[in-house]
Amino acid sequence: MKKVGIIGGSGFIGSYITKAFLDNGYGVKVSATDITREDKYQHLMALNQAENLYVSELNVEDKVALADFVSDCDIVIHGGTPFILDVQDPQTELFDPTIIGTENFLEAIKNTPGIEKVVFIASVAAWNTNFPMPAGGKSLTDTFDENDTKFTSPASHPYAQAKFIANQTVEKFIKDNPNLSFEISSVSPVFVSGKSMSNREDSTSTGLQFLIKNKIAPDDFIQALYDNNVSFAIVAVEDVAKAIYKTAITKGLHGKNYLLSSETYSISDMNLMLNQEEPKEKPAIIYKNDLAKKDLNMNFKPVKECLFNFKYITK
């Protein structure tokens, strides 16, 4: 039985990835930062084929633990970087775990025989740290795809900057190591929407959907989104997981980084759809998904279907 290691495999996106690999007959090893916190991963135990699931404690800043985690894996998915918007200390909360964690991970996989494929869950921020606003030099209606120049700004949110630098680190590693025995590919989802598999309320993605659904602004950043009726390119969490699974099992994608996106809607229309009401405007296509459709044979769900089905679990 082939084994996949999924760093961040119990999170919002990671849970769906774990399900995809279990459903397809893989042994799955999922990381947990604190294995005593069973509430973080207990929802995975109800999945089909959960007898092939293993949970292993891991801190990505611990090189020894990382080397041990990847040591018996055929495929490794790295989605274990923090997604925090209300950040107090960007260096310790975002930059260190994201960038140092990526550097440590690259060192671990380079020194581990037997790995066949590595997939990084990057972010639209790996392409444009201004998201959901346009990249520098582009208008609100200009499209963006993998042929466009990557854009970053020191004024962007620390989360976006950290993801951009981490992706640059991966690209440099690929360039500096032309004779790797395994392939490395990345996916860069836009705003990820959908239902959480767990009953936890600590996911930033589901939390943002809850805020938009109820038009709550806990800080100036969120309030500005409402005030400017900002538009978001959106993708369903199930589609992100499917794209990651397909990327992991498909040969010949070394060095590719796929934008994962469906349609773009204004935040006011997102609010309507999250409340099962029809949007006022038709969707736009800003972040293009042609490459993922071509290479991965992906079809992306309409955003309306995804937002209409959103459920936020409250105790």
Residue map of PLM features:
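Amphipathic terminal alpha-helices
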Residues: 290-293, 301-315
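Glycine/proline-rich active-site loop of Rossmann-fold NAD(P)-dependent oxidoreductases
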Residues: 179-182, 194-210, 246-257
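Active-site Tyr-X1-5-Lys
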Residues: 152-184
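Conserved Rossmann-fold NAD(P)-dependent oxidoreductase catalytic core, especially the SDR/UDP-sugar
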Residues: 88, 93-154
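Substrate-positioning beta->alpha
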Residues: 203-208, 221-246
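NAD(P)H-binding glycine-rich loop region in Rossmannoid oxidoreductase-like domains
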Residues: 35-100
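Mid/C-terminal beta-alpha module of Rossmann-like enzyme folds, strongest
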Residues: 229-231, 241-289, 310-311
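N-terminal Rossmann NAD(P)H-binding glycine-rich loop of SDR-like oxidoreductase domains
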Residues: 4-26
